[in-house]
Amino acid sequence: MKVAVGSTNPAKVEAVREVFLGIYGDVEVVPIEVDSGVPDQPVGLEETVKGAINRAKQAIEKTDADFGVGIEAGLYRVPETITGYMDVQFCAVVDREGRITLGHGPGFEYPPGVIRRVFEEGVEVGIAMGELVNDPELKRKIGAIGVLTHGMLVRKELNKLAVLMALVPRLNPEWYGL
């Protein structure tokens, strides 16, 4: 089985590789640099989902893969949170028939100073968080979640949960009409 990932970010590519390998066995994963078609910092579930779907569709279109996978992180409004926003990773999986399945991982809140920079300066959360901890490559490694959870959960693992949730309908095709 061949799986194209609409990203070259190691935290995304390895997450896809590990989940697909665990479910399907022998898997070839091909990272493809694509344009998400949404702002670098998506805001709202609609924008975030659109980015994940765009990445998945472009990945499968540019290859002969069986599946295209897109992962997009974005902020969305949540009442009663400290900042008013939470971050979530959405995953889209597209097959050769054009069927899309979606999933997302756990949501979490960025520190208020990071959210303020996003909305006042237009800085992407990953960049703002990387600057906060003096690690410009943070989002390609343990991610903000790795820093915020003191290493208990890293970005790859967060992405793996989103990928697994997107595969739920494919693991149970008879219940989802696939």
Curated annotation (Swiss-Prot):
Residues involved in substrate binding: 7-12, 64-65
Annotated EC: 3.6.1.73
Gene3D superfamilies in UniProt: 3.90.950.10
Manner of cofactor binding, per the entry note: Binds 1 divalent metal cation per subunit; can use either Mg(2+) or Mn(2+).
Needed co-factor(s): Mg(2+); Mn(2+)
Keywords per UniProt: Hydrolase, Magnesium, Manganese, Metal-binding, Nucleotide metabolism, Nucleotide-binding
Entry annotated with the keyword GTP-binding: no
GO biological process: nucleotide metabolic process; thiamine metabolic process
Any single Pfam family the record assigns to this protein: NTPase_I-T
Catalytic activity annotation: XTP + H2O = XDP + phosphate + H(+); ITP + H2O = IDP + phosphate + H(+)
Taxonomy, superkingdom: Archaea
Entry's Gene Ontology molecular function annotations: ITPase activity; metal ion binding; nucleotide binding; ribonucleoside triphosphate phosphatase activity
InterPro entries (alphabetical): ITPase-like_fam, Non_canon_purine_NTPase, NTPase/PRRC1, YjjX_NTPase
The keyword Magnesium is annotated on this UniProt entry: yes
Residues that bind Mg(2+): 35, 64
Function: Phosphatase that hydrolyzes non-canonical purine nucleotides such as XTP and ITP to their respective diphosphate derivatives. Probably excludes non-canonical purines from DNA/RNA precursor pool, thus preventing their incorporation into DNA/RNA and avoiding chromosomal lesions.
Family per similarity comment: Belongs to the YjjX NTPase family.
Quaternary structure (record): Homodimer.
Descriptive protein name: Probable inosine/xanthosine triphosphatase
Organism name: Thermococcus kodakarensis (strain ATCC BAA-918 / JCM 12380 / KOD1) (Pyrococcus kodakaraensis (strain KOD1))
